[in-house]
Each structure stands twice: as C-alpha cells, then as structure tokens.
Amino acid sequence: MTLALGSVAPAFSEQAPAPVLPGNAMPAPEVTLPMVAPAVNPMIIPGAPVRSVTLPFADVAPRPGAITLRGIQPNGQIEFGVRSDEVVTQATLNLEFTPSPSLIPVQSHLKVYLNDQLMGVEVIDKDQLGKKNHLQMTIDPRYVTDFNRIRLEFIGHYQNVCENPANTTLWLEIGKGSSLSLQYQKLPLSNDLAHFPVPFFDARDSRPLSLPMVFATSPDAGQQQAAAILASWFGTKAQWRGQSFPTLYNQLPDSHAVVFATNGKRPDFLNELPPVKGPVVQMISRPDNPYIKMLLILGRDDQDLLTAVKGIAQGNILFRGETIGVDKVDRILPRQPYDAPNWVRTDRPMNFGELKQYAEQLQSDGIQPNPITLNINLPPDLFLINSSGIDMRLKYRYTSPQLKNTSRLSISLNNQFVQDLTLKTGHDEDSQLLHLSLLQGLLDGSKDLNIPALKLGAVNQMRFDFDYTSLLASGTEGRCETYNTVPNHVVIDDSSTIDFSGYRHFMAMPDLRAFANAGFPFSRLADLSQTLLVVQPQPQPVQLTTLLDTMGNIGALTGYPALGVGLTEDAAKAKSTDADLLVIGNLPADLRDDSMRDEKKASLLIEAARDAVNTPVRQTSLPDNTAPASDARVDASAQISAQGPIAAVVGLQSPYFDQRSVVALMANGQQGFEMLNKSMQDSKQRAQVFGSVAVVRDSGVSSLKVGDTYYAGHLPWWERVWNALANHPVLLAVMAVIVVILAAILLWTGLRSLARRRLSDDDQE
C-alpha cells in the first residue's frame, strides 16, 4: 500500500494536567508515612468538558459482583481504564462490606491499594462485626494511569495465638452494591492520525463503542458499502465491548464521529473544505468544539470512499499527521474458509499460546491459585456428531504439593467437569522443563484427554483449577505450631495444544443462533467475500444503523473487516450472484409467499397493515433442543393486524443457490428498527435468537423453529447414510438384517455357481 502523508503534529497539547505515572512506574518511596498524602486534584483546564461516572462492582468486579475475602484468599480487585483524551480529577471508592462476627476488632482491618500504592486503611471495630457497613474513601487521582487496579487486602484475626488462616470464621464480604465514582475531564488533542484509532476508539475504554456516522443525505449503495466495511473494522477493535453506529444526515455530531463526503455530495458544515483529488482520510475538530473530533472519509466519488476505508482497515499502521492520501490498496492473497482470526484453526492443532488474550493469562499463584481460563471460539458448522471427542495435549507446571496424592488439577469446560489429574510430588518424564522453576521447585505433567460436547458457534471457556491441600497449622492442646505460608505457582504451558483438524463442515439450516453468535453463514469467509448485502434504496437513518451495527457485530465475532462484502439496492442482482444474502428491510418478492403456504419461503412477514407468521407442529423453547425436522413442519398460519412496533430476524434457504442462505432483518417502522438494534446489542436478548424466526417486541425476543430444513456444507454419501441411520436404531437394525440377508444370498449364489462349474468340468473329463 502507498500512502500520501500529511504534516505531523503532537497528539496532545502541551498544556496538560499534573503528570500521570506510566503503568509500570512506582512513585518515590515515602519512608516516614504509611500512605500517600491527601489527594490533590490535577489542574483543571478552564472550559474543558467534565463528566462523572459511577462504576458499580456488579459490572467491574468478577462475577457475580460480590467479593469474599478469606484468610487464605485475602485479596480482591477491580480494574478500570482511562481514555487517552481524558484525565481523572476526582475518585471516590464507595464500599459496602460485612465483616465476620468472629473477628478481633482493631487487629482486623481492610487495606485499599491503587496500582499497588496504599490509599487508606479501614480499621474494623466491634460495632461493625456481622453487620453491613458503608465506607467512602477518597482515591488520589494523581496515581491513576491508563490502566488501573484497585486491590482490597483483608487482614483478619480471630484469636491472638495459634491461628489457622484457613479457618472459616475469617471472612469479609464486599457487597455488589459497592461502586467507584470517577470524575473525568477532557484533554485537548491535536489532529494527529499517528494515534489512530484514538480518539474514535480507545482500547482503554471498556464501555460499548458508540461512533456516529454522518452523511450529507441518504447514501447510495457505494457509500453504504464503504460505511459497512468501516463499521466491521471498528467492530474488530471493539471486540467484547459491543458497538453501535448511530447514523446522521447532514448534522454535526455531538461526539467523536466519522463523516463520509464526496466532492459532489457533502454535509453543509464541510462546504468550505476544498475538493480532493483522490481518496483522503483527514482528522479535524468540530468547528465550535475542539474537544470533538471528526474522521473525514473523502473522495471524488464513491469508489474513492471504498479505497479510503480499505486503506484504514489495512494501512492504518502508517498513518500520521492530519491528512493522509490512500493511493491504492491491493489484496495479495484471498481469504480461506474458516480462517477468521477469532476462531480456532481447523487445519492443524493450535497452541494455547495462540489463544491467549493477554501475557499472563496461563499462570496463577497463591495459597489457592485462582482458576486459569482460556476462551475457545469454534465455527458453528463443525461436524462433531459421532465423534469420540477432541484431543488436547496438556502440559503444565506447578509448585510441588506438601502432601502426597491430595492436590489435583481439575479441568472444566463451560462449567461442566471434564477430568481431574493428580499433582504429583515427584518428577515425571517432562522434568526437563524445570528450568522455569519458581518457589519450592516446579514439576511438569503431561496428559492426554478427550473433551466432551462443545458449544459450536459460541464462546467456550476452558477452566483449569489447581486445588492444593496444604498443612497450615497443627499442634496439640497447649502446644501450637504455625507456618509461614508460601504461595503456590501454577502454569499451563503455551505449547499445550488442542486439535480440531480433520473434521468436516456440515450443519442443518436455518439456524439463527449461529447468525447471532457467530455471524454465520456470512462469516465462513472472514472478509465476507461470499456475502451480498441487499438494502433498501434511500434508507432511513435507523435502517442504515441496523446495517452498520450488524456489520460491526460480525467484525467483532470474526476479528477481520468485511473487505470483500458486496452491496446492492437491486434485489434482482441476487438471482445471478452466488452468495449468501443479508437483507435489511423488506423481503424481495422471490423470498416471500403472501399465502404463507410455501414452506421454502419466509415463515414470517412484517408489513405496515398486517403481519403473518407460520407456527410449527411442535415448538421448542430451548435453543439446544435437538428436535427432529418433522417437528418444524408448518402446522398453522396466522395473520394479525395490530399497532405498535415489531421487528424480526428470519432465516431461510436461498431460492437461487441450494448451498446459500438468506437472513433478513425486518421491522415495521423506525421504532421497530430501534428495538431490533437494541435487542441485537443485548447479550441476554441475543441469546434467545434461534431457529428460523425470531420476533422482537417490547416484551423481548421469541423464537420459532418452523419451515423447511436444509443442509449447508459437505458430507460424503456414506457419512450421510450413517448419520441418518444413527438416529433410528430400529431402522438401522432392519437395514443390518437386510444387508446380512443380501450378503448371504450373494454368497450362496456364488457358491452354487462355483459348484456347477466344477461339476461341469468333471462331466467333461
């Protein structure tokens, strides 16, 4: 890629608040003071916008939001980030806590740290024991950095001598009603793309991404395609946070936003911008507010806009200055099926190190180490039926247990127990890995195991619990023995592997759960190069938001932008395009049957005057219910006239190509589309989307599995026959008997023929 570069300017104004320490820096030690000096707010910049935020523990603490501190697990923590264009000027920790009634007052206390710097100590008195208490503690904002950790350390005592730190009376409960109150102030930014995608997306911000996209008027197909590609790219950045892209026509945005404009079609606030001579990406401030930035996607025509957004998706590492030009973007290698970066590879075993999301994910320490977790995303159509399991080669290291045959490693998948392995006190065949030894020496273990059924098209969480039995205190009456506890260290080796290779891709469709959780079947190719978006001419802003939100969600699920997606306003183009169809708005005539009697057409229609739906013979209420296809046959059809918003997601087989699918997102008006957009951003409501029809109302999401079932993917004929017979044991037995009889007849006939031939030869002699 070749980029024309603009001038380079500092990303931040020189006029800044008091310095903030980097994430790995420690303040100068204060020998005479047990904690930091009273908080002093950073310098306030006159006129800079300020916002206040309360972070409840229910959202930022580990699930379920409440934290229980114990004698052998005395630490709990929450984490929060600060955007690059903001600084924290005030911080207050609001704690709701209940101490054990068995604690000794004054000797027991709670210490609060920010980034390992002591912020304060709460001494527990006798009036607080066994009761719910509230505490407000000021946090010094000078020690807030871009990534922050507030740690709570419980110091508890229940008797003066011979204490056992594992005693069950040693506890302190931090309630989920606790919160952290923060006041943020905006920082002035220069228009420098060297920090892109900041400020439009900031990885330090854990909130869902909300990025308005602005057009001069209702965009044509080319501008919609460019916006869809860019939305999918921002989705790859937002990942688990979620994302939404409100659409504006000829309006100044109230927050950081993206603006699409050609020389002939621009919003009014860009009329004075000179014409461009090619694809251009530029960062400017809102004319009346320097704290709001706009990312301009400029070009002579729609083709230039497409080139510009592809330059953002694949060449942003070279960005700097206020303005850059994108000369060209060339694709070198086509994407291969199922190679989405967020999915586990299915062409070879995959190392755990490739699945890590942060550096120290596969290690833990403590008297009882916290569980180690690893997320695994699988393609929805992986054919695992009749499979004995997935092979996993596990290598792990751990501190040698004190007691023999009492400590073990428990392995769970999606909160279901898989297997446990004994942590041995002696060396095994992998002891050559001892060069990574930590405290008390490390042992190495290596085991093979099979994994039971996985959730396809969803996030699977593998959890490793190292459970230690430790001798913490002992003795007899009048004679006490105590030990200074030493933390245990555990590591799952990066070279451990999990193998999904060798499996075919085949699944029953339609399956809206695969669409909601994995963007399937469109995500089969990560760049969506076999996907055609069918949109309405002159879409309303809320309809365009539906398209952009959907593309952003697919990008977040695959981890790759939709650089190859096609888009058309002409539904007739779908007849000649061998692609999966994603329809936004009304269904084309070829996909609907107004009589609702054709099971190959859509099983739900939404119109301004009436709605119609088919219902199945037997309805399942659970997405995982593996009911036979006969239960999904159409039992009845109903037509309803009603007021109020309604929306739906409908899946069906493409009438143009047998191996292609259609997913349509429909609504009866602006309120219906708004409701649809909110439901698809809500993880709880999205989990209720399955089957072939998902209806969205104010009450929530209701799904149906109704209509024809078809199959996507490929299975050899013998595997299809075996799979069909495997679900019908009686038929399988009958077929086996028939095969045996036929084999016996053929054998008997062959033997008789051979006998006649021998007798004939004897007669001739």
Identify the meaning behind each predicted range.
Residues 14-765:
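Solvent-exposed alpha-helical segments and adjacent loops
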Residues 1-7:
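Bacterial N-terminal signal peptides
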Residues 8-13:
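Sec/Tat signal peptide C-region and signal peptidase I cleavage site
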